[in-house]
Structures are given as C-alpha cells and as structure tokens.
C-alpha cells in the first residue's frame, strides 16, 4: 500500500503516526511536530503527524474537546505546510469527513464507530487513506468485515480499494480496563490491510477516574515492543511534552523526551522481525 509517498506493509520499514491527542495550541503542535520530524528523519522512519480538532467521545461533557473543526484544521494545515509533513486527524461525523479531507493526508475513524456502516462507507469514499480503528468490543476477525465494507464503498465510487489500514487499540477486559492480545495482529493481517498498533490507547483505563480516563503510560514501551515483534506495518503513539498537564489522554501519553529512545528500540526490533519473516504463515503448509 502506498501512503503519503512511502510504501507500508510487512516487507517495508515501520512507520509512525504520532502527536498530541488533541490540539491545544498552534505552538504546541508546531513544537511537537518539529521535534518528531527531527527524530524520525535521523532514524529513517516514515512519519505522519496526528492530532484531533474535536474529541467527541470524552468521558465527561465538561472535558476539553479541542479548538473545533475550522480552527483545528487551520492549525493542521499550518503544520503540513510549514513543516512539510503529512498529517492525520480523526473524524466523528460525515460532515467532518468532507471538511477534513480537504486539508489532511489521512483520515482516522474512531473505534466506537467501526460498526457504523454509513460512516465507514462515507470515509472510504472521500478519496483519502483511512486508518480504521478496531472497536474495543470487537473480535479481531470481525475487522475483516469492516475492511470489506470500506473496500466495497471505494469500489462503488470508482476509487482504489488499497487505501485502508486496520488499527488495534486493545479490547475491553471487564470494567475500566483494556488488554492487548498480540494474536489479534496476525488475525487482522489476514484481511490484507496493513495493520497499525495503537500503543497508547491500548494502555488507557477508560473511565477509571470517574469523570475522565486513566492510563498506564509506563506500559506503552512494553506493548509497543511486543506489537513490533509480532509484526505490524505501523505504530501509533500519542505524545506530549508534559503529559500530566495534557488536556486529553495525558495518563497514557508518551513523554516527548522519551520518544527518541523508544523509537530507536522499535526501529531496531522491526528490522530483526521483518528480516527473519513470519514463520506462523507457514504453519498451515
């Protein structure tokens, strides 16, 4: 699959989707994007900057949601223009899809909306690559159906069917907890879509703090290493210079100062994993 000018897949180097959870200010976006650009350039790692203009699924109605669509897209356009970076943002309504597709390079659909056929189909018809997040309530093999819906919508619109990624972000494990089953990555790969692992939302503790979600950011490196060893096309991580003061998802964000060390490990591990291939693919032979 071609994505933002580079190839993605199990025979290609690991790519990164990263940035603050939500747009807090234009300066923060520029600072974080600039630092990530420098780190990934040194590592030879393809990079897509991400951030959200509206967090429509916050735990509390009083929580900060973002600057709104118009202002948020304006800031993302600035990052794209001034730093020459591809950008990704998530969309929550069909109106968002049309507006965001005019500005960003990649769209992302929320995990909670992965079963909404009309929404997934609308995203698939926008002409942009789409990172489709697996719902916390979905078995990994059910993502094949979601990818098939997107491909069918693209086909009916006369567009390429090779523009969709499947993103794992953990599965509900009782109340206020998620678990990551690394088998899901291999199962989702069978859809033929590149698989991305969301290492930060996978350590979220949804709603565990009453009016907001908690998280175990110290476990991000653990799950990220495991996912890259299992074999993925890309890794998704939210990061912030000061996670304890972040306006959204701080408890599961990677401190920006640790991103280089973590990415160095992941790039090295990805090279070993992909160089030796995937023995599991031959077990049925």
Curated annotation (Swiss-Prot):
Pfam families in the record: DAHP_synth_1 (PF00793)
Q: What is its main location?
A: cytoplasm
Task: Tell me which EC number(s) this protein carries.
Answer: 2.5.1.55
Gene Ontology molecular-function annotations:
3-deoxy-8-phosphooctulonate synthase activity
Q: What is this protein called?
A: 2-dehydro-3-deoxyphosphooctonate aldolase
**Annotated pathway:** Carbohydrate biosynthesis; 3-deoxy-D-manno-octulosonate biosynthesis; 3-deoxy-D-manno-octulosonate from D-ribulose 5-phosphate: step 2/3; Bacterial outer membrane biogenesis; lipopolysaccharide biosynthesis
User: Where does it localize?
Assistant: Cytoplasm
Any one GO biological process: keto-3-deoxy-D-manno-octulosonic acid biosynthetic process
Q: Does the keyword Transferase apply?
A: yes
| GO cellular-component term (any) | cytoplasm
Which HAMAP family does the annotation name? KDO8P_synth (MF_00056)
- Record key words, sorted: Cytoplasm, Lipopolysaccharide biosynthesis, Transferase
- Reactions performed catalytically: D-arabinose 5-phosphate + phosphoenolpyruvate + H2O = 3-deoxy-alpha-D-manno-2-octulosonate-8-phosphate + phosphate
**Which family would the database say this protein is a member of?**
Belongs to the KdsA family.
The source's superkingdom equals Bacteria
The gene behind this protein is kdsA
